[in-house]
A protein has these predicted regions:
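Short glycine-enriched loop/turn motifs at secondary-structure junctions
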Residues: 1-2, 51-54, 116-119, 188-191
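Catalytic NTP-binding/metal-coordinating core of nucleotidyl cyclase/transferase enzymes
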Residues: 1-69
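Conserved catalytic motifs of the protein kinase core domain
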Residues: 2-5, 86, 193
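Intrinsically disordered, glycine/charged-rich C-terminal tails and inter-domain linkers
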Residues: 128-219
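Residue-level signal for well-ordered alpha-helical positions
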Residues: 21-22, 73, 137, 209
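Catalytic beta-strand-to-alpha-helix segment of the class III nucleotidyl cyclase homology domain
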Residues: 58-165
Length: 219
């Protein structure tokens, strides 16, 4: 069956070297924290961890926008936590064949994997077509063509990152991303207090969290 999906591959840079130098136990702790972050972000963004790949993961989204945000959130969490190992990621979207119910065959999944391979530390590389699905607070920088192993023609790439907060930084109270207020989604909690969000889904979650609990009278 042919479907349209978006794919992200993310992994820990330098994990093999870190394991050789620091030992198995510290490496296991770093990997456990990485996987916990990926699980939590994927669950919150409505994307799915399709498989674990040792020190990496393959993430699949029905829509491209939530996948882009998920990858940038994972990178931001790793940066804020001063993780011992930085992450890198590659993204692509397009039609693929859903094979035996749980695997995907096609150019987009292969491209996303290769982009993760060529990305540097703290880089999120994407096929340029993903720019059409990015929220306003995401910047597509360094547009260029690159020869990718396994692909006949050069691929046009961009590096995705959050816009610098500028003079009016705001923090999404749900996911913790720091955004420029001019590009954030304005909203409010159920109590009417103003707030800013990275996405309508975070705005909806905040509204639910702040909704007053109505006591049910005893009968």
């Amino acid at each position: 069956m042919r479907v349209v999906r978006s794919f992200g591959f993310v992994d820990l840079c330098g994990f093999t070297h870190f394991t050789a130098i620091e030992g198995d136990d510290p490496a296991t702790r770093v990997l456990a924290e990485f996987r916990r972050t990926v699980r939590d972000v994927a669950s919150g963004r409505g994307v799915r961890v399709a498989k674990w790949l040792g020190d990496g993961a393959m993430i699949v989204g029905v829509q491209a926008g939530p996948l882009v945000v998920a990858m940038l959130e994972i990178e931001a969490i790793a940066e804020d936590a001063r993780s011992l190992l930085p992450i890198r990621a590659g993204l692509a979207t397009g039609p693929v064949i859903l094979f035996e119910g749980d695997d995907y065959i096609g150019t987009p999944v292969n491209l996303a994997a290769r982009l993760c391979d060529v990305a540097g530390p703290r880089q999120v590389l994407a096929a340029s077509g993903l720019c059409d699905y990015c929220p306003p607070w995401v910047m597509a920088r360094d547009r260029y063509e690159m020869a990718i192993p396994g692909f006949v023609d050069p691929v046009e790439l961009v590096r995705l990152s959050a816009r610098p907060p500028g003079d009016h930084p705001v923090t999404d109270p749900v996911c913790g991303l720091i955004l420029d207020a001019a590009f954030a989604v304005a909203g409010a909690g159920a109590d009417g207090a103003p707030a800013w969000f990275c996405s309508p889904s975070c705005a909806s979650t905040w509204s639910e969290r702040t909704r007053p609990v109505v006591a049910t009278p005893d009968r």
